[in-house]
Amino acid sequence: MKTPCDTPAVLLADKLHFQYLEPALFTNFSVRVMPGVTLVCGGSGRGKSTLLRLLAGVQPLSAGQLHIHGICLQDEPEAYRQQVLWTEPRSTVFDELTALQYFELQRRTYGGFTTSHLAGLIKGLNLEPHVNKPLYMLSTGSKRKVWLAAAFASSAAVTLIDEPFAALDTDSTGFALQLLEDAATHGARAWVIAHFEQPGKVALAGRIDLGD
């Protein structure tokens, strides 16, 4: 039986440096992201969202390296990004697509996308009345449900979610918590979520505390 020490990390961040103001937000920042759920916490302005963008490979690093299952962002950027699911919560890039069209786009992007699982996610997140609407017509909470449904169906090696419960109704928050509780104990996927506290009873594989 494998012990936690034997389990290989899914994502390795080595000596990351990022700066857009003085002082640098991240200096020689290294972390091993294991399978399961890792929490990124910290006060406002400490860089939680920025760290997710850096790990996703969409925010350029000043220095350092990122690897997912041995694939280096700097050497193979396209292959690296195909291992990561990240959607900017406030993104308008997909606004002209319906929710179903967005899911189809994600299915083509991620080879392990589980269409059979998607129907249950749509139902559990109360998205059924909205799947044929263009995303620009959806409320902030409903758009976040679309991002969450795609995330849980994607089978991406690394899934990054910024404030997963923001603007969700009570039932959908409970459903998302159940999904994260299951993700924490099953499978080889790594989930990195930015949130101000440990979500519910989700067992954490790691915690990245950026301070107050």
How would you describe each model-predicted region?
Residues 1-30, 34-35, 77:
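A short, flexible loop at the N-terminus of ABC-type nucleotide-binding domains that lies
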Residues 56:
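Helix-to-loop junction immediately C-terminal to a conserved catalytic motif
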Residues 64-75, 79-80:
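Conserved ABC transporter NBD signature motif
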